[in-house]
Amino acid sequence: MKILYSIILFCLVSMIFLASCKSDNKINSKKRSIEYIQNDLKPDEFFPAGQVELQIQSDGLTMYGFAYTADGKGPHPTVILLHGLPGNERSLDLAQNIRRAGYNVIYFNYRGTWGSKGTFGFQNAINDAISAVDYLTDSINAEKLRVDTSKIAFAGHSMGAGIALLAGLKDPRVKSIVGISVFNPFTLLQGEGAEGNLIGLKEYLLTLGMLNCNPNKFLDDILAKLDSYDIETQVSRSNKAILVIDEHQNNTNFSKFNPRQNFDYKMWNTDHAFTNRRIALTKEIVNWLDDTMLNKEKVK
């Protein structure tokens, strides 16, 4: 009887041990430790996290940026961070935290902004985001930066969020998209309030000396292609993983996509820069990236 009891006890302990091992190895955002936010991590002896300055070509012109490379040999899933207009809020606090969670993060300035060559335009910036993917998926750059080219995501704020959606929805190499306070020209620049929005944008662009940009041409180019910037329609035709967190009501129609497994639209009570929600925003983004790029059960 004692022998039988010992065998049963051994089997139960073994099952619990195996289950715990399986749980520890499975990427699950609900169980991810937040140590990456709370504590400094011990660097890998041979492949420590670092920063690499980048020069990315877009239509033959140089864009300047840098990579926050993740700790460890990799290759690592990689997030391309897309800034807004003009890019005063770079979200580098998010970049550092996302990197500490095990992701490479790429930051760059679009053509015609902050010293990058060329002319700043909305469509140009969309093309620039795709050029950044081209850069990362080049075999030499991927090896140097330890990029897992099968796990690339866009994360953008404001105008950068609109760019992330419009570029990411069309590029099969981008597996997941995060949009924070999404700038949606299709809803902002037509219908009620459009005239005021256009005037406000033009007046704001006139104050932005860090941009090589003609405000009239910038806006005229958007209006000429407005139908191609219909984010809602493009989302409806895609099964790509998308997280949108807004603090405004310009995209409330996105909520109709919430029943989809790979879509989540939320509205938070905060300001445009999410000033009082930076830690919560970090956790929300990292959990989303974990679920949609690392936890394959949640990826369609």
Describe every region a protein language model picked out:
Residues 18-20:
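C-terminal motif of bacterial Sec signal peptides marking the signal peptidase cleavage site
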Residues 29-73:
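N-terminal cap/lid segment of alpha/beta-hydrolase-fold proteins
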Residues 166-215:
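Hydrolase active-site cap/lid region
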Residues 76, 83-87:
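Active-site glycine-rich loops that stabilize anionic/oxyanionic intermediates
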Residues 144-158:
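Alpha/beta-hydrolase fold nucleophile elbow
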Residues 98-117:
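Conserved alpha/beta-hydrolase
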Residues 121-143:
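Alpha/beta-hydrolase active-site loop
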Residues 218-290:
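Serine-hydrolase catalytic core
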